[in-house]
A protein has these predicted regions:
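Extracytoplasmic low-complexity segments
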Residues: 21, 25-29, 34
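Intrinsically disordered, low-complexity Ser/Thr/Gly-rich stretches
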Residues: 35-209
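Short alpha-helical segments and helix-capping/turn motifs at coil-helix boundaries
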Residues: 17-21, 135-138
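Short phosphate-coordinating micro-motif centered on Lys-Gly-acidic
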Residues: 6-16
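Intrinsically disordered, low-complexity regions enriched in Ser/Pro/Gly/Gln/His and often acidic
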Residues: 11, 26-28, 199
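Short, small-residue-biased leader/transition segments that mark boundaries at the very start
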Residues: 1-3
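Short clusters of hydrophobic/aromatic residues that line enzyme substrate/ligand-binding pockets
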Residues: 18, 24, 172
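Low-complexity, intrinsically disordered regions enriched in charged/polar residues
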Residues: 5, 28, 104-106
Length: 209
């Protein structure tokens, strides 16, 4: 198949396969919404209180998938929270789990002073006022196998991140305003391809190690 004259984006999934898209994030997707604490994304551990210690916070997980799931682009997590002070941080880790074995497929992090997004710092009345943190994951392209689950864990910070400069206790609220949104890809009809293989002697020597 000749693809040299096609204008588009080459994308590699977390399973290693390559395909072509006209743009990224992709335009031909279907958005699905899972409510935190619902049957689709139920509580699986932890508590709804996030302390600034990187070790506390809620965990949510889907039931085992009934079919393979393909999604990509920029998943969103919109979550209602209350804080003790004007500040706080949420780190969201998204994982593909097969029983007790999980692999990292994406993450998001937000300084709650910017919970509406953008560069304008917001303010609110701590404890009494609920805010909705509109988080966006770093770009993902994931294939999740049938029978696996998706797990999302919330904490104050994650691996390779520093503690928040404005630490605060954060209380997560479940319900209709707290949702994980992902964009489903239909793999049928996509242009798949194998990238050129390296035949240099250095590559061949490395493969033989």
């Amino acid at each position: 198949m000749c693809i040299r004259d096609r204008l588009g984006v080459e994308i590699q999934s977390n399973q290693g396969s390559w395909r072509l898209e006209d743009r990224y994030p992709m335009s031909e997707t279907t958005e699905i919404l899972w409510e935190l604490g619902s049957a689709e994304l139920s509580a699986a551990g932890g508590s709804n209180t996030i302390f600034p210690d990187a070790n506390s916070g809620p965990v949510y997980e889907t039931p085992p998938l009934e079919e393979n799931l393909y999604f990509g682009g920029l998943p969103r997590l919109h979550v209602n929270v209350n804080t003790v002070t004007v500040g706080g941080q949420i780190y969201a880790l998204l994982e593909d789990c097969d029983g007790s074995t999980c692999i990292h497929i994406g993450h998001a992090i937000m300084d709650l002073r910017y919970h509406e997004g953008g560069g304008q710092e917001q303010t609110w009345i701590p404890i009494f006022e609920t805010i909705n943190a509109k988080m966006e994951f770093f770009a993902i392209d994931a294939q999740i196998e049938e029978g696996h689950t998706l797990r999302i864990s919330l904490a104050s910070t994650g691996e390779d991140y520093l503690p928040a400069s404005t630490s605060s206790i954060v209380e997560i609220s479940e319900g209709s305003n707290s949702n994980l949104l992902i964009d489903i890809i239909q793999p049928g009809g996509k242009i798949l391809f194998d990238p050129p293989a390296c035949t240099h002697q250095y590559c061949l020597d490395w493969l033989e190690q």
